[in-house]
Amino acid sequence: MSAMRRCTCFIICLLTSYTYGTTELVEYTRGDIEFDSSNGEKIIDISTTKGIRCEWKVSSDYYTACFKWKFIWDQVDKYEVAGFSGQITVNYTTDSEGQKTRTVKVNLTDPGGEIWYNVSRSRYLSTYYASYNYTLEPQKRHMEAMELDKYFAPVDDRDAVLIVEGKKLHVSSCFLSFHSTYFHDLFEYDNSTSLLNIEIPVEGVSYEDLGLLLSVVHSTATFPNDGNSKKLLELASQFQTPYVLGLVENHLLTNTFAWNETLMLLADKYGLMRLLGKSIRRIDSIEKARQLKDSVFLELSDSAKVKVAYHMIQLL
């Protein structure tokens, strides 16, 4: 098989991964399991649901049992999801009261987090019966709310007023023009008269989104993070603000939970060449090449596809 054909085979292999919708729940049910009370810890059930692997363990002796659920979600896009919350409902037998049902709260922020529940019995019992189900809700990362009225109030060095959705943002036309071709052209169009107190409407963006972009440009309140970086890239591209693109790229290069595939797509879409190069170099083994999702490769631009394919050939 030629090197190029082998490379193509690597590219079309799928990596099991999951990205969650806005209100999507993760649910799983395990019916009754019988297990003995011999000492030691044992795994009695393993499941994978929507990218979450759950290992159900039990440590038991004749009088007590400790149920443990270990949730492994390293195949969930942590760039989008900060954790999971919900509950586990466990059913188990007792010597005196028959079947019992208990609900255990779940709040996961660690991709390898464990939830424990202890069961005590009043007398010897050699055999246990138990079942459980869980329902988890992904906790999406969100942009932090900002006090835009406070950060963009009228002050001496702000000579222009942007009107977005009927609300005002007081800005420095000189400073904003330096960082944004869009605003340079906008203010130049209106410079036949003094900009002082002139209200300039801005269309095609919400008040909160434009406030987010301007707060990063002015370094007044916000810096790029995993919660706002996708939106900032979109806004920086729309309003031709390379300074913000650079800030977001620096964040994604050094301090992000994003999957490498996510970084590769963002880098290619917004022309972040340092990030694109790093994300390609991270594919540093044949195994990682096999794991590249075909949907990701097909979404890349032609020039990025060439770079990825050439890099993979070097691994052969």
UniProtKB/Swiss-Prot annotation:
CDD domains: BTB_POZ_ZBTB_KLHL-like
Residues covered by the BTB domain: 158-226
SUPFAM superfamilies: POZ domain (SSF54695)
Location within or outside the cell: Secreted
Domain of life: Eukaryota
Pfam family, any one: BTB
PANTHER family: BTB DOMAIN-CONTAINING PROTEIN-RELATED, HELIX LOOP HELIX PROTEIN 21-RELATED
Protein name per its UniProtKB record: BTB/POZ domain-containing protein Y57A10B.3
Organism encoding this protein: Caenorhabditis elegans
